[in-house]
Amino acid sequence: MKSLILTTSITALLFVSCSSDDDQPIVQNTVEAPATYKFMRGSESTVSFEGQTTRILMAGETANAFMDFDNATEASLLAMFNHQAGNMDFSDADLNASDKNLRSKTAASYDYFFTNTSESAAIKATFEDYIFAQINEVFPNIMVVATPGTPGQIADGSRTRYVNAKGLEYNQAFAKSLLGAVMADQMLNNYLSAAVLDEGNNRENNDNGITEENKTYTTMEHKWDEAYGYLYGTSANPETPNLTIGEDDKFLNEYVGRVNDDPDFSTIAAEIFDAFKMGRAAIVAKNYEVRDEQVAIIREKISEVIAVRGIYYLQGG
């Protein structure tokens, strides 16, 4: 502490002793957030999150296939979850051609699973267990009325649900688990992680405007956009996604929209979007303190959204 005080005193003395001719103006690196999520380098957009859009679409089609009682098999659902480029696993040709899949990004964040491969493998296996159980427990009993101890269907007058012997809907368990183990985990614990944003020479390259080979964006810009894509990747207009928030997918986007519809949380969609565009603007401005402040906001608000929806489902039974 004495050393710190001494150092501070000497520094202050040096400032006082310097001639005013030598004083340098303090440059404030302020960040102005744009009105929309639009970022350009010259005349070209620097925003890219195609991989996230692809995985959201894959997730939606795979979850829907859980209810395709006429065509789905254990093999077909497993193939959708662990898609290999060129295989005809989906109805969309672009998804079939993609080298992306869901399994590789399940429980795969840097912060939580980089050194914890055994837990990652166990979580991946849970998804495969849901597939096995849906085919082998629920499918044979779709015409049976479910009762405690017996899988089958529950009709409540508005829709029919298909459950296991304990009342669990495997299709919902699969979809909601994707929301957590892929979308939220990749966003919050991977692409917004300082270990990923600042990996290697990312800061230096961003400071110097060095883009990835044959791309318009720096690596740091792209990592931020990939986090953004897990929430807004299928938005009708990704530059102004809150115009349709809650309508663009059945995962995080829907969750944020539903929570935002609650008068008690009516600003949460705006707060999340504002933090995303402010953080991206901070990266462009090379202001990493502001960037990290926005990461904290996004993590808090997305976690709050998931908690609110969890309570809603628990209260609904």
Regions found by a protein language model. Give the residues of each.
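Sec-dependent signal peptide recognition
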Residues: 2-8
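C-terminal motif of bacterial Sec signal peptides marking the signal peptidase cleavage site
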Residues: 14-17
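Bacterial signal peptide processing site
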Residues: 19-22
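Mature extracytoplasmic or organellar-lumen-exposed domains after removal of signal/transit peptides
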Residues: 24-317
